[in-house]
């Protein structure tokens, strides 16, 4: 059983009798001497789909749920459901648009390395690769000689995702984006 400080995004925990999937972790350090860090977990209740916020001290011990991961690829859209296919045995996994809204910002037809997270045989989440390649759909014109500058500008991707990119990047450039931090890494 891990401590709160050992938890990561994508883990499933049991808290107050509910099975929760961790979507985001925010760490705060209270002022004063000897204050332990506080971990604010933004979670989704796997039974109801409701959003739940939980707070724990760094040394609180939590129960985790056993999870399995299977490689998947995006298949098609059926109404408001997105269908993903297991790469090994072609099992379909359906997710409603609002369940995977954040992940959809990174999912293009050519994305590789996605996994479905299974808890008790049920698909509960999609795990993205650590980085994805995307083509910039719209950004301000590039500035010649700006490679020495550290200034950035917003760039919009075909999925609607907006990231800050260096000034020398232009519309149509293929870039690599860190999915966890939603930040530009480099040109592809």
From Swiss-Prot:
One of its GO terms (cellular component) is cytoplasm. One of its GO terms (molecular function) is translation elongation factor activity. GO terms for biological process: peptide biosynthetic process. Coiled coil: none annotated. It holds the Pfam family EFP_N. SUPFAM superfamilies: Nucleic acid-binding proteins, Translation proteins SH3-like domain. Belongs to the elongation factor P family. This is Elongation factor P-like protein. The lineage of its organism: Bacteria, Pseudomonadati, Pseudomonadota, Gammaproteobacteria, Vibrionales.
């Amino acid at each position: 059983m891990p401590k709160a400080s050992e938890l990561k995004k994508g883990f499933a925990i049991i808290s107050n009798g509910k099975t929760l999937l961790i979507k985001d972790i925010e760490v705060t350090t209270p002022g004063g001497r000897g204050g332990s860090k506080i971990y604010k977990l933004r979670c989704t209740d796997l039974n109801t789909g409701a959003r739940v916020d939980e707070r724990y001290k760094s040394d609180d011990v939590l129960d985790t749920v056993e999870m399995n991961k299977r490689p998947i690829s995006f298949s098609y859209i059926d109404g408001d459901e997105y269908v993903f296919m297991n790469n090994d045995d072609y099992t379909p996994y359906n997710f409603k648009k609002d369940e995977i809204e954040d992940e959809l910002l990174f999912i293009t037809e050519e994305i590789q390395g996605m996994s479905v997270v299974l808890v008790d045989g049920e698909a509960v989440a999609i795990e993205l690769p650590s980085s994805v390649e995307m083509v910039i759909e719209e950004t301000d014109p590039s500035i010649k000689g700006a490679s020495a500058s550290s200034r950035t500008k917003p760039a919009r991707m075909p999925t609607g995702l907006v990231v800050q990119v260096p000034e020398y990047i232009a519309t149509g450039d293929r870039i690599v984006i860190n999915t966890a931090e939603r930040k530009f890494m480099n040109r592809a």
